[in-house]
Every structure is written in structure tokens, then in C-alpha cells.
């Protein structure tokens, strides 16, 4: 899917790029697979902001995506490739032989009319969901479970792909897009192939209005605020930009650069063999 660019006739069109949506085959979602949900604006039940930078935006219907693929051994046909406003990847509408319809994250190269299947006996082809114990080593995979039966939790974004490196003692070693190498139970399911819409990374919003349309609010720098509002606020000029004694922090005082917030005793550390930065995990 290519990206459209424009002549700089206006300041907002100078750098903006759009997806051409040529891969979309159906514009309206399946009614039985959508629901509405009231927006929170990043506020909790007390009305306090718990997630900054969220608010406004166009109304969006939630597509109910099947991340578990529990209909094992039943063949499904791809009926359409659809747009989902709440994720970067496209969705594929499947219709099973018994008439049931579901959405899945559309892998790259999936075409309308393709036949898909899930389960241990499914062939290792693009779009099929298999347990890691039956996936051939070296294949690209996505939609990976962390706990058997919970549903896919990793590698679901546009263009995402992981690689099955090896299997040993009931675990599969997977190289994630971040570079991390992690052990996952070989009974966990994964989908063959790469997530589609890989050109999404080349889309440039180009103007503030597109961010607001997506529900993204402006982010204000702490250095530009007053001392009462942020630990880095105040001063003449850029006196608190991280030089000298001043440490850049979050609004709540946590160091912003280099400070590790992950718990050193986190239970899942034992499953990480190589970290994202390429260094081996100490307790692996």
C-alpha cells in the first residue's frame, strides 16, 4: 500500500502524507461485530486525569476482533479487508463454514477469497493460527499469545513481525520486533506472516488538526511551564533543560532519562533471554 504525497500549496500540505487505502474492500463494518463505548478523555471514575494527551476526536465504533481463534479445524473464507479507526493494522472479515463471522488482524498479502484455518492441524500458511510447537522454525509470526488460551497479546501493530528461532524444553524462543529474545510456552498460539499495512510508519500527520481528529491532545513540555506546575518549570530562558545540576523529570519527580522503572524482581524476567538493547538478561 503506497503513501500519497501532495504539492505544498498550503503550509499544512507541505509535509503531510496519507495512506491511499487501496487495500480496503469494504467501507462499512459488520454490524454484529461492532459496539459503541463512551469516551473517557483519559479520566478515571473520579474524574481525575490518569492518561494525559487523550481527548476529543471523531466518534469511533469498536470492532470486536477475535484474538483467540478457537474454531479449530473449521475453514474460513476472507470476505473483506476493512479499516479500523482504533488500530494501525487492517482487519480481515472471516466467514466460517457454519456462517459465523469474525474479525482478525489482516496479515500482509492476505486477499479476499483466501481460505484460513486455525488449530494444530492447520498448514503453516499466511493467516493460519497454530500453536508454536507446530510452527516451522524461522517463519515470521505475529499475534502471539503469552499465556495459552488468553488470546494474542504481542506483535499486533501494522508491519509487526516476530521470528520463531528455536524450541527447547517446552518453550519457544522468539525474536520480537524490538530485538528482545523471549521464551514463550510452546502451547501458545501465533499467526503465520507479517501484520499488514507496513507502510503506516511512513504516514506523516502534518498538522495539529489530524492529531485532534484521532483523539490525541497536545503535549506541553515541562521546561515551558511554571515551577508550580512542573519540577522542570521556571527560570530565565532554558535554565532547566537538563544541564548542570538540573535533572529532567516527569511531573511526579521520576527521572526522565536513563532511570529504569521496571521491577528487578518482576516474575516475567525469567522468560527474557536478551533485552531490547542487545544485552543478555542477568537472571535469564
Annotated model-derived regions:
Residues 96-99, 177-178:
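Short acidic-glycine loop/turn motifs at beta-strand connectors
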Residues 99-111:
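Beta-strand/loop nucleic-acid-binding surfaces
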Residues 89-93, 101-103, 152:
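S1/OB-fold single-stranded RNA-binding interface
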Residues 1-87, 108-284:
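Basic, glycine/proline-rich low-complexity segments that contact nucleic acids
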Residues 93-95, 173:
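Soluble periplasmic/extracytoplasmic beta-strand elements of cell-envelope proteins
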Amino acid at each position: 500500500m503506497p503513501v500519497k504525497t501532495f504539492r505544498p500549496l498550503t503550509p499544512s500540505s507541505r509535509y503531510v502524507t496519507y495512506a491511499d487505502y487501496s487495500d480496503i474492500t469494504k467501507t462499512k463494518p459488520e454490524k454484529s461485530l461492532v459496539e459503541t463505548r463512551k469516551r473517557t478523555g483519559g479520566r478515571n471514575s473520579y474524574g481525575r486525569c490518569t492518561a494525559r494527551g487523550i481527548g476529543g476526536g471523531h466518534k469511533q465504533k469498536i470492532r470486536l476482533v477475535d484474538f483467540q481463534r478457537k474454531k479449530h479445524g473449521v475453514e474460513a473464507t476472507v470476505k473483506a479487508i476493512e479499516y479500523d479507526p482504533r488500530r494501525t493494522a487492517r482487519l480481515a472479515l472471516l466467514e466460517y463454514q457454519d456462517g459465523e463471522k469474525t474479525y482478525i488482524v489482516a496479515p500482509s498479502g492476505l486477499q479476499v477469497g483466501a481460505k484460513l484455518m486455525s488449530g494444530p492441524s492447520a498448514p503453516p500458511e499466511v493467516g493460519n493460527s497454530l500453536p508454536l510447537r507446530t510452527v516451522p522454525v524461522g517463519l515470521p509470526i505475529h499475534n502471539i499469545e503469552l499465556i495459552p488460551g488468553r488470546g494474542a497479546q504481542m506483535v499486533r501493530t501494522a508491519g509487526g513481525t516476530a521470528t520463531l528461532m528455536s524450541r527447547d524444553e517446552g518453550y519457544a524462543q522468539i525474536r520480537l520486533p524490538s530485538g528482545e529474545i523471549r521464551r514463550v510456552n510452546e502451547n501458545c498460539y501465533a499467526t503465520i506472516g507479517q501484520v499488514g499495512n507496513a507502510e503506516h510508519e511512513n504516514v506523516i500527520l502534518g498538522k495539529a488538526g489530524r492529531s485532534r481528529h484521532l483523539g490525541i491532545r497536545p503535549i506541553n513540555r515541562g521546561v515551558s511551564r511554571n515551577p508550580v506546575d512542573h519540577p522542570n518549570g521556571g527560570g530565565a530562558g532554558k535554565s532547566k533543560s537538563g544541564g548542570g545540576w538540573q535533572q529532567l523529570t516527569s511531573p511526579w519527580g521520576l527521572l526522565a532519562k536513563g532511570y529504569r522503572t521496571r521491577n528487578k524482581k518482576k516474575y516475567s524476567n525469567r522468560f527474557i533471554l536478551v533485552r531490547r538493547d542487545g544485552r543478555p538478561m542477568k537472571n535469564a
